[in-house]
From Swiss-Prot:
Reported function: Involved in the biosynthesis of a nickel-pincer cofactor ((SCS)Ni(II) pincer complex). Catalyzes the ATP-dependent incorporation of two sulfur atoms in pyridinium-3,5-biscarboxylic acid mononucleotide (P2CMN) to yield pyridinium-3,5-bisthiocarboxylic acid mononucleotide (P2TMN). The source of sulfur is the enzyme itself: Cys-176 of LarE is the sulfur donor, thereby being converted into dehydroalanine, and is not regenerated in vivo. Thus, two molecules of LarE undergo sacrificial sulfur transfer to create one P2TMN. Binds nickel. Is required for the activation of the lactate racemase LarA.
Active site: C176
NCBIfam families, per database record: ATP-dependent sacrificial sulfur transferase LarE
One MF annotation (Gene Ontology) recorded for this entry: ATP binding
Record bears the keyword Lyase: yes
Gene: larE
Induction or repression: Induced by L-lactate and repressed by D-lactate. Is thus regulated by the L-lactate/D-lactate ratio. Makes part of the lar operon (larABCDE).
InterPro entries in UniProt: LarE (IPR005232), NAD/GMP_synthase (IPR022310), Ni-pincer_cofactor_biosynth (IPR052188), Rossmann-like_a/b/a_fold (IPR014729)
Protein name, UniProt field: Pyridinium-3,5-bisthiocarboxylic acid mononucleotide synthase
Upper classification of the organism: Bacteria, Bacillati, Bacillota, Bacilli, Lactobacillales
Keyword ATP-binding: yes
The entry's keywords: ATP-binding, Lyase, Nickel, Nucleotide-binding
Amino acid sequence: MATLATKKATLVAALKDLQRVTVAFSGGIDSTLVLKMALDVLGRDNVTAVVANSELFTDEEFDKAMSLAEELGANVQGTTLDYLSDDHIKNNTPDSWYYAKKMFYSRLNDIAANNGSAAVLDGMIKNDENDYRPGLKARSEAGARSLLQEADFFKTDVRALAQELGLTNWNKVASCSVSSRFPYGTTLTHDNIAQVMAAEKYLRSLGFPTVRVRFHNDIARIELPEARIGDFLVFNDRVNRQLQSLGFRYVTLDLGGFRSGRMNDTLTKAQLATFA
């Protein structure tokens, strides 16, 4: 297996070949490492960071990503995407994330064409080759590059190099689109999205940074890391009251704990194979 130094060298060589790039930037550790390395290798004038603002991510996440890109010294621009204008996304179909990523990559390609970039870069890593990843198909169709994935970076590699480079978010908890909180086939609205976002914000304020509130109409199913379930029990009453005030009739705690991609358990083998 290649060492971290070897993987870093592969990443540097790939960046040098591209000369000028546009980076899809979310503020997460993966895209932060891509942006930092691009800036170090190519210089500020040859790198543009793009942050998407949409209904599926919080305003707080957008603002933090914009600020972080600026702190890193990047030329950064925000772009607004109306994901709910696409019926596949609005109806949360099993392939909805393909259409969401397709919309984003299309916007990124337009921006890259305008600034003369040789490529659009994202933060996908080797771990992203597993599970159900419709975003991989959208990326391939758009011609975007995942240099971390190409250089065999796993999450442990990303965190190690990010820490080595002094990136403040090297151990940041991963986040993802709020659509992942809804069962496939659930119609996404501004109201139920806001309901879930408010519930998760409240739970994070209690000291649970890794949390998911899965939406099942009038039922909120809370997922936490199994090691934190015991800590959570002292907050039962206040959490129940707060989430009921947000519109949930029943508030439940999933004893199976947190697991990313949980909603994909309902997909058939044929559906999973669509984007394999």
